[in-house]
Amino acid sequence: MRAGHKIVYWANEEPAEKIKIRLVQSFFNITRKELEENRPKYRPLYREHIQPYLKVMSAVGMSVEEVDSYAKLNKPDIMFCDQLDKFRISGEYNRGDERLKETYVYAREIAKRNKLLFWAVSQASNDGHDRQFIDYNMMDNSKTGKAGEADIIIGIGKTGSSDVNNIVRHICVSKNKINGWHGPIDAQIDVQRGVYY
């Protein structure tokens, strides 16, 4: 947004409005309470810095074909699909991993055809629970199909309690066709603001 890119965030995991508020908090580096207490201050800033560039929409029950049509019509620069695994796709598949592979192939084609960055959000399988480093072998419900279609895969791991005070996260780049760098990065999350440091 700060660079002037048009961004679309398709939400089918959490309600779209909740995601949008979280993105606004993150953009301004503020808590939900600070946002609510200072709406007159942030409303014009939102209209200037976020509203022209960001659309957050519900994607419950949506297909990748509909995402493709939207991209052709509206020409965004970046699209997030959270979670891409839950998007429908035409065709019949014998196994879930075959359907997922085809979904990710289609997503890659959307990116190429429309010259946009396509960011697919997915979950780790149970293998990733309480793990420091989440690599692409731990992606949920996939053999190699999802990983094969991605240019970069970033896993976010966490160990220890689920308590809000556990702010350490481990970011693991396990595939990188962009510049080849792989490895872990330790970070801290400000849970109240949705910002990593």
What are these regions (language model features)?
Residues 1-2, 112:
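Anion (oxyanion) recognition and catalysis
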Residues 33-35, 55-57, 88-101, 130-137:
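Flexible beta-alpha connector loops of hexameric P-loop NTPases
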Residues 64-79, 106-114, 126-197:
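C-terminal regions of RecA-like/P-loop NTPase motor modules
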Residues 13-14, 83, 116, 120-125, ...:
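A short beta-strand-to-loop transition that corresponds to the Sensor-1 phosphate-sensing loop
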Residues 17, 86-88, 125-128:
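Short, active-site-adjacent cap segments at secondary-structure transitions
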Residues 8-11, 55-56, 80, 120, ...:
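Structured core elements
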Residues 3-75, 89, 184-187:
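Cytosolic-facing regulatory segments adjacent to core modules
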Residues 77-120:
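Helical hairpin unit composed of two closely spaced alpha helices linked by a short loop
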